[in-house]
Structure formats: structure tokens, C-alpha cells
């Protein structure tokens, strides 16, 4: 297996023949033509180089359409049963709840974890090494529930140490959820042990450090895995970190307004997440399309006037060297001139000439590999004009 942390020398000789794209256990995580960091038009030739492409999905996505074999997967929200901890990292309240599923799995459809467990077995690996709760295929649902119960037990143990009672597993799995914020006498703040209690940070100085001694040491470059001085994995550092410096420095944005390419592509694109989707997920939901949410490119009145008097609802062509897309315009004074907005997660729907009429922001994104930590997938430079053709 070769990934982004691999020795660069391996990658130069890497010539893959087969791709199994599972994308984890969440459906929106495996539509990579829309959600990955490279342009859709540049990913497709890479897919077509594969002699064999297997895609595991719960919905038919643009990526899935390129697969040689499609394996149906249980949907993690509607068909699986999962303990979910979420909310806090996305600006909401921190909560722990149980997704019990709302429909039974169709036919013999299996979960991602079952498939990976069986793959491990076929490769000669003890399946319990991958999923320790596994006993037999017939007992899979019971094995999975034991796994979820153990996950929840960690929650109850955590609160028991603080003398806080939480719902039993039986109550929790039948609808009660935990609002973590309500269980704390005071709002949660990070690093209380260090800042309020005087406990040293796990750094060389024991204080917050703004300089990475690890990155400064060139002997560490090229390793497959990186660990800090206390043995913790640095899981977001690539094998070769390129021009990354050990301390923060200002750099001009790649494909930003300081880029000389603005002479050819004078508009900067922002691609925020839509309120009505999770990445690509829910694009196919008619209740959230047209009536509630309309997938349009936002453009300022000043930029609309200088481009032939573009009006609300006019079809426009957005393009750069990465690709072309066509979508309706939304003219609004909420944007400054020189900036347009296309929401992330639109469906990639190219015509015979490669023009994307689903208007996925990924079509025009990509090509920025300056940062090995966070390849930018939120901004780029484009030109925009009235579309003169007909929609397919």
C-alpha cells in the first residue's frame, strides 16, 4: 500500500494496476471526483489507467460511474447502527447519539467493515486483527452491536469518573442522546490542565511552542511516519514536507489575487460548503434542490455589468486551464468585485466536450501542491462570461 506518507523514491516507480475505492464508511467520503483535492478532469485519466477499478458505495455518484465493479454498501446513517460523537468540531453543540438506522439493508448488502474484515481474511490476515469483535458472518450484527456498546462504555466510564450519570445503553440505543455541554457546570475550554493547573505541555520546553524542532531537523525528512519527542504520531505530516518551514511565515496565496495569472483569469473563486449538503451527499434529494437551494454562481453587480450585463438566472460559463462549467448566475451585492462563489459538492456532469453542466467546483479547482499539509481546495482563479450555447 502506497500513500501520501510514503518514501518519495517508491512513488517514482509506482505503477498501480488496480484501485479499490472504499472511501471509509461514509457515503460522502467516496465521491472523489467531487470532494478530492485534484480537478475532476485530471482524476478521470488517472482512473482510466487502472486495469481494474472497484467502487464501494451506497449511492450512485459521478465517481461510481467509472467503476468496473460496484459493490453496494450499507449506508452509515440509514442502514447501519452507529454511536456518533459529533457537532463540536463544526460549530454546533457537542453531542453523542445513536444512529439506529431507519430502513433495513437491502438484499445481501454489507457494511464497509465487514468487507474489509473479509478482505483481511482472504489476504491471510487474522480478521480479528482488523476487527477484534468478529466471530462469524452469521453473528455479524451481534458482533457489531458489541463493538458499539464498548464504544458507549467509554463514554459512561468518562462521565462516571466525574460523578455524572448518563443514560444506560438500553435507553441510549432507543433514542436518548447526550448533550455534552449540558453535563458540564462550565463551558469546556481546551488545555485547562496546563493553563489553569500548571501541568507542562508535552513539548521540550513544557510551554506552547511556535517552532518545530522536528521539521527543522533534516534527518527526519523522507520517513514514512513521524513521531514527536513523546512518541505520539504526527499524523498530518507528509513523508517529504517540501518547502514547509519549522515556523510560520507569510506566503502569497497560490492562485490568489497576487498571482500573475489574474491577467488571464481575473476572478477569484471561493468554494464554501453548502448549508444543504454534506459534500456531495443530498445533491440528489429533490426537497433540497430548486425549492430550498439553487446551485448558482454568486457574482457582484459590478462584475456582472462588465460581462455583458449578466442578470439573475442567466447561464454563465466559468472556466480556467483546469476545466469549464456552466451554471445559472446569482447577482448579489453581498460580494466584492473580483470575487465569485460556487458552493462545494455539485454533481460532476460533463458533456461530450468535457463541459460540466452539474457545476462541480472541483472541475476548476486543483493544481496547488505548495502545502503538503493542506492542499488548497477552496480557492482558484477563473474567468466568467455569458454562456452562448444551449444546455443539454
Language-model features: locations:
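Extended redox/cofactor-interaction regions of prokaryotic respiratory oxidoreductases
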Residues: 1-66, 75, 81-82, 172-307
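Hydrophobic alpha-helical scaffolding
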Residues: 9, 32-33, 85, 89, ...
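Short, solvent-exposed loop/turn segments at the edges of secondary structure
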Residues: 14, 65-66, 90-98, 377
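Acidic, Ser/Thr-rich peripheral helices and adjacent loops at domain boundaries
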Residues: 72-86, 332
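Short beta-alpha connecting loops at secondary-structure transitions
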Residues: 78-84, 94-105
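Short strand-coil-strand connectors
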Residues: 94, 204, 263, 319-323
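Long, contiguous, secondary-structure-rich segments that constitute the structural scaffold
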Residues: 100-170, 282-392
Amino acid at each position: 500500500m502506497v500513500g501520501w506518507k510514503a518514501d518519495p523514491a517508491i512513488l517514482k516507480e509506482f505503477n498501480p494496476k488496480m484501485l479499490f475505492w472504499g472511501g471509509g464508511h461514509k457515503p460522502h467520503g467516496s465521491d472523489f471526483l467531487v470532494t478530492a483535492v485534484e480537478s475532476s478532469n485530471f482524476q478521470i485519466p488517472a482512473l482510466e489507467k487502472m486495469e481494474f477499478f472497484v467502487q464501494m458505495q451506497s449511492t450512485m455518484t459521478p465517481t461510481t460511474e467509472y467503476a468496473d465493479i460496484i459493490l453496494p454498501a450499507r449506508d452509515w446513517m440509514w442502514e447501519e447502527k452507529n454511536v456518533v460523537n459529533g457537532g463540536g468540531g463544526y460549530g454546533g453543540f457537542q453531542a453523542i447519539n445513536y444512529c439506529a438506522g431507519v430502513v433495513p439493508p437491502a438484499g445481501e448488502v454489507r457494511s464497509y467493515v465487514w468487507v474489509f474484515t473479509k478482505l483481511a481474511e482472504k489476504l491471510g490476515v487474522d480478521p480479528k486483527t482488523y476487527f477484534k469483535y468478529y466471530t462469524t458472518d452469521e453473528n455479524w450484527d451481534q458482533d457489531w452491536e458489541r463493538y458499539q456498546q464498548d464504544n458507549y462504555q467509554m463514554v459512561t466510564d468518562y462521565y462516571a469518573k466525574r460523578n455524572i450519570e448518563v443514560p444506560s445503553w438500553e435507553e441510549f440505543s432507543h433514542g436518548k442522546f447526550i448533550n455534552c455541554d449540558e453535563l458540564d457546570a462550565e463551558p469546556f475550554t481546551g488545555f485547562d490542565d496546563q493553563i489553569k493547573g500548571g501541568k507542562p505541555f508535552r513539548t521540550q520546553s513544557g510551554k506552547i511552542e511556535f517552532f518545530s524542532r522536528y521539521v527543522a531537523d533534516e534527518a527526519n525528512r523522507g520517513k514514512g511516519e513521524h513521531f514527536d519527542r513523546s512518541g505520539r504520531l504526527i499524523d498530518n505530516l507528509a513523508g517529504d514536507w517540501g518547502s514547509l518551514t519549522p515556523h510560520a511565515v507569510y506566503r502569497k496565496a497560490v492562485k490568489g489575487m497576487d498571482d500573475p495569472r489574474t491577467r488571464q483569469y481575473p476572478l477569484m473563486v471561493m468554494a464554501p460548503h453548502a448549508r444543504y449538503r454534506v459534500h456531495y451527499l443530498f445533491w440528489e434529494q429533490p426537497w433540497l434542490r430548486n425549492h430550498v437551494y439553487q446551485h448558482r454562481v454568486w457574482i457582484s453587480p459590478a462584475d456582472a455589468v462588465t460581462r455583458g450585463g449578466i442578470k439573475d438566472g442567466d447561464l454563465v460559463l466559468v472556466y480556467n486551464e483546469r476545466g469549464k462549467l456552466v451554471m445559472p448566475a446569482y447577482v448579489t451585492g453581498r460580494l466584492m468585485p473580483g470575487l465569485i462563489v460556487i458552493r462545494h459538492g455539485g454533481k460532476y456532469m460533463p458533456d461530450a466536450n468535457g463541459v460540466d453542466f452539474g457545476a462541480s467546483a472541483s472541475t476548476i479547482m486543483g493544481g496547488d501542491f505548495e502545502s503538503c499539509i493542506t492542499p488548497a481546495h477552496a480557492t482558484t482563479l477563473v474567468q466568467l462570461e455569458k454562456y452562448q450555447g444551449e444546455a443539454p
